[in-house]
């Protein structure tokens, strides 16, 4: 039996990003500007709670320590708390996180924590309510801010906030974000805009390197923090005068893929070795019975033989990723 997921480049995989739906109720300009549209084959049958439980059990047995539930908007699923509880059945999973647009946080975050959720990432691309509305297509800024407060009240000690960095949109907002996190335990994460199949023109207009933010941080006395083995790819910076931190995710940086530690499973049960990779390796046929666990683990481990050393974004190759709701970014 395979005991640990390792690829041909000696990278070990402790982190699973598990999409539970493609559906999202926001219309973010960099992801789903026209809103969610079912494909021509009709409504997809997303992974059931039992299938998710079997996936998480297999990955936990293969050394996974961290699972992040993604989408789409994962909290739109009516059984979201059941999904959280199913993943938390695995004691080897030390961190169970969600990436959310925050739409339901104010109402439901306490229930998520009670079910076993341990970490939250919230997408907030602007601290200006009008600009937030323009980016997301939803006038929900106050609601999302209330949700962040509710998460702290529910007992989450630190929250991560994701901001997609866009030239001419929010790249001049660093000081506003830093002021916001000065007395709040928030890790502010600036994510470089990435080119996808549907977003090439947006990328050409708005991409800006996260290095511009890094230069400003270092000049202001911020210091780099070393990552843990199940952390994501962010370069994290701290400052003694701030409760919050800043993370930079820069996929176009040299050697970005050298420390890759995550795999992805789509909402229909395909294993993706890279966000910008192949069409995926089907797992769903091995998710129907608990007795299939050994075969499932063997298939997952065998797939790693095909993982490439890096992506090809610099050549404009985004693989089969049409938009970031497809396998959860």
Curated annotation (Swiss-Prot):
[4Fe-4S] cluster 2 binds at residues 257, 260, 274. It is an enzyme of class 4 (lyase). The gene is moaA. It catalyses: GTP + AH2 + S-adenosyl-L-methionine = (8S)-3',8-cyclo-7,8-dihydroguanosine 5'-triphosphate + 5'-deoxyadenosine + L-methionine + A + H(+). Residues 8-229 form the Radical SAM core domain. Keywords: 4Fe-4S, GTP-binding, Iron, Iron-sulfur, Lyase, Metal-binding, Molybdenum cofactor biosynthesis, Nucleotide-binding, S-adenosyl-L-methionine. GO terms for molecular function: 4 iron, 4 sulfur cluster binding; cyclic pyranopterin monophosphate synthase activity; GTP 3',8'-cyclase activity; GTP binding; metal ion binding; S-adenosyl-L-methionine binding. PROSITE patterns: MOAA_NIFB_PQQE (PS01305), RADICAL_SAM (PS51918). Its EC number is 4.1.99.22. Its cofactor is [4Fe-4S] cluster. GO terms for biological process: Mo-molybdopterin cofactor biosynthetic process. Catalyzes the cyclization of GTP to (8S)-3',8-cyclo-7,8-dihydroguanosine 5'-triphosphate. This is GTP 3',8-cyclase. Pfam families: Fer4_12, Mob_synth_C, Radical_SAM. It comes from the Bacteria. InterPro entries: Aldolase_TIM, Elp3/MiaA/NifB-like_rSAM, MoaA, MoaA_NifB_PqqE_Fe-S-bd_CS, MoaA_twitch, MoCo_biosynth_MoaA/MoaC, rSAM.
């Amino acid at each position: 039996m395979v005991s640990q997921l390792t690829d041909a480049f000696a990278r070990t995989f402790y982190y699973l990003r598990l999409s539970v739906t493609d559906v999202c109720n926001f219309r973010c300009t960099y992801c789903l500007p026209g809103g969610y549209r079912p494909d021509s084959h009709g409504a997809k049958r997303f992974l059931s709670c039992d299938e998710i439980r079997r996936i998480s059990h297999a990955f936990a047995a293969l050394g996974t320590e961290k699972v992040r539930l993604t989408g789409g908007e994962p909290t739109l699923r009516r059984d979201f708390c059941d999904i959280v509880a199913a993943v938390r059945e695995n004691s080897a999973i030390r961190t169970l996180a969600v990436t959310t647009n925050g739409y339901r946080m104010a109402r439901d975050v306490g229930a998520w924590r009670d079910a076993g959720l341990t970490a939250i990432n919230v997408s907030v691309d602007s601290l200006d309510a009008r600009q937030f509305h323009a980016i997301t297509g939803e006038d929900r800024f106050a609601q999302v801010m209330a949700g962040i407060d509710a998460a702290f009240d529910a007992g989450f000690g630190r929250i991560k906030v994701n901001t997609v960095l866009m030239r001419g949109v929010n790249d001049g907002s660093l000081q506003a974000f830093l002021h916001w996190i000065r007395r709040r335990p928030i890790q502010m994460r600036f994510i470089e805009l990435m080119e996808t199949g549907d977003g090439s023109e947006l990328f050409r207009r708005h991409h800006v390197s996260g290095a511009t933010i890094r230069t400003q941080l270092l000049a202001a006395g911020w210091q780099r923090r070393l990552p843990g083995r199940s952390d994501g790819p962010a370069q994290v910076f701290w400052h003694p005068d701030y409760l919050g931190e800043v993370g930079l995710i820069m996929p176009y940086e040299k050697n970005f893929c050298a420390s890759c530690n995550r795999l992805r499973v789509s909402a229909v049960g395909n294993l993706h070795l890279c966000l910008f990779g192949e069409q995926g390796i089907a797992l769903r046929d091995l998710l129907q019975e608990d007795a299939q666990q050994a075969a499932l683990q063997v298939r997952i481990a065998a797939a790693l033989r095909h993982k490439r050393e890096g992506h090809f974004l610099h050549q404009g190759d985004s693989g089969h990723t049409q938009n970031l709701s497809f396998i959860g970014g």
